[in-house]
Structures are given as structure tokens and as C-alpha cells.
Amino acid sequence: MKFLHLADLHLGKRVNGFDMLEDQRFILEQILTLCDKHGAEAVVLAGDIYDTPVPPAAACTLLDWFLTQLATRKIPVLAVSGNHDSAERLDFASGLLAEQGVYIAGRFTGAPRQVVLHDRHGAIEFTLLPFVRAATVRHYLPDADITDYDSAVGAALAVCEPAAPRRVLVAHQMVVSGVCPPQLSGSETAPLTVGTVDSIDAARFAGFCYAALGHIHRAQRVGIDAVRYAGSPLCYHLDECGAQKSVTLVRIGKRGVEKIEPLPLTPRRAIRHLTGPLAKLVEHPTDTEDYIWATLTDPTPLPDAMAQLRAAYPNAMRLDYQPQGAAAQPADMTQAVRGKPFAELFQDFFTKMNGRPLTTEEVLAVKKLREEASKIE
């Protein structure tokens, strides 16, 4: 059997205010083409199907279209909820969908969902384990010895009687190999704790011939090739730009996994990072429809910099400053300003914009305005 392993679609996601739905539909169309080209006999969706628990209607319509396209092709779908999804909403109409070959495990209610498919060698069991927390597993399995995430997942899997000699796990969790954590990305906005009670050791999956994981946005193996994160099909952050996104084609033979092959994806628009003086960046623009994250090296901030940048690159997403010769600044300025008093922040901003510090009179005026504003708040 050949199946495609996908994860972390994050349908409905916005990146720096940009709606990514058109890009997501483009990449889903490409995935359907890969299904046809490689003769995929199933598609696995390992969680974070949506970006939020209450996704926009257009995102729901897009998922409906994608699932319908797969069902029309008679390609079974095996999906679990992720930490971004509403498990209850994903479970809606799951019984009816199963009759069309779309198997969705939204909530964990005491045991993973087991689905058996067949190929010419016999049965293959897909064990669908949605995103779970230790407290949830403890609620449904009160007699199990659950002390952390690792033991919780172990207890959840232990209740499953193997339904076939060849077994595939579909899960959405933080999985580590011993003390080696996976490589994270900036687009993973949920707090991820690595190497502590919040992670699961890949050794828990020894009874499966392949573990199809979601949660981490960089495609990678965890310890061994058969325990794998598919990664997100699109780049959603600066630190992912330049990375080759893919879906994973897995071939299960008579005795287990025979081949694991990443199939490269080409986005509608790439995310690119440009660095240099503004005048140089906009002088000879190329690939102007790409999403641009710009770091300007001009000595002082320019008031209309973003407008000039978007005149050359309409999809410019973000702009940061790092004057030539200055120490590198974090891309996320939240960390840089956290804990600084208001007066210092305003002084820094004024100096950058005007090339001089505030005078004593101006400092007093700002302080007075701040006090008056605080009374209004």
C-alpha cells in the first residue's frame, strides 16, 4: 500500500495579516496531483487541520472540497485532531464521513480509533490517536499509571488490541528520541516543551511499522526513518524560508515499510528574506509576487519604508531594521522590548526617528501625557 502522509495544514491561517487560503488551495491541488501521479491508496492527515478551534467558513469550505476530491478518487482519508483544532467540531458527522472512506478521530474517549484497510498482502491497521493531554487520558483510564505525557500516550495505546500484523500510527504530539528533540520552527505558536514531561519517547511506537506524526512544521525523522514528522506543506515563518516543503510518500509492503520518499511541493508564492538598504531592495525587484520579510540596513528608520517596499513587492509581510554595523536584532521585537519602561521605549523610538534624544523639556512633556493617559485608562 502506498499512502501520503500530511500534517499541519493550518487551514484558515493568516501570516502577518495575510490570508493564506489561496496559497493553501494551490498546495492542496498540488497534493491531489501527487496522489494521482503516484497512485496513493490512502491519505493521512496528522492533525492541525485548521489553524484555530473556530476556523473561518472559507477554511471549512476548503477542507470540504479537499475531502470530496479524495473521496471521489476512492482514496481513504485517516485524520486526527491537533492542538489547534476543535476535537468536537472535527467529530461532527464523522460516522457519515466514515461511510465515504473519510475516517476522523477528533476526541479521545478512552481508546484510539482503529481503522483497517486492505492491500494485496492483507490487512493494515491505522491507529488514530488525536492530540491528547495527560489529564484527558487519566480521566478515561483512571486505573492506569499515568504520571506524564509519555505514560499517558503509552496507556492510551495499550488499550488497543492489534487488529492486523502491519500497523500504522497517526498521532499529533511532541515526540523525542531519547534526549534528542526535533528541530522546531518559528511558526509553531503553541508552547512546545521538549525533553520534559510534555514529550513522548519514540520508543513508545515500537509496535508500529510507521508512525505518521504531526505537530512540528519541519519534515524530519525522530530517531529512525519510520517515526516521522511530515512537516507543514507551506512555510509560515521567516526561519522556514528556503526550506524545501514536501509531503511524504510511504510504501508498506508484506513485512512493513519498504520505502519512505519525500515528494517536494512548490508554493504559489515563496517566503523570502531580503536584507539591505531600502533603495537597493526596490531598485531591481524580482519575483515580485513572493511574500517578503525585509531587514533594512539604513542608518535610521524611514517613515514610508513599508509603502515603498510594497510598491515593489505588493506582498511584503514584515519589515525590521538592523543598521549596518549594528548588533543583530531579534526578528520578534516582543522579546527586545519586554520589561522596558515606557519612558525608555519612547526615548529609543524618538531617537531612531529623529536622530537625536529627547530634551529635558520633552521628557517632562511625555511623562505628563503618559500620566494623563493612564488616568483615562
Placement of each model-derived feature along the sequence:
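Active-site neighborhood of divalent metal-dependent phosphoester/pyrophosphate hydrolases
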Residues: A40-A58, K74-E88, M174-T196
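Active-site neighborhood of phospho(di)ester-bond hydrolases with catalytic His/Asp-centered motifs
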Residues: L6-A7, V43-D48, P76-N83, Y103-F108, ...
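Metal-dependent catalytic neighborhoods of phosphoester/phosphodiester hydrolases
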Residues: R14-N16, I49-F66, S81-G101, G106, ...
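Conserved catalytic scaffold of divalent metal-dependent phosphoesterases
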Residues: F92-V194, P233, G253
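Binuclear metal-dependent phosphoesterase catalytic core
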Residues: P112-E125, L129, V227-D290
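Accessory, non-catalytic peripheral segments of nucleic-acid enzymes
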Residues: K37, A42, R251-E377
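Conserved beta-sheet core of the metallophosphoesterase superfamily
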Residues: S177, P181-E258
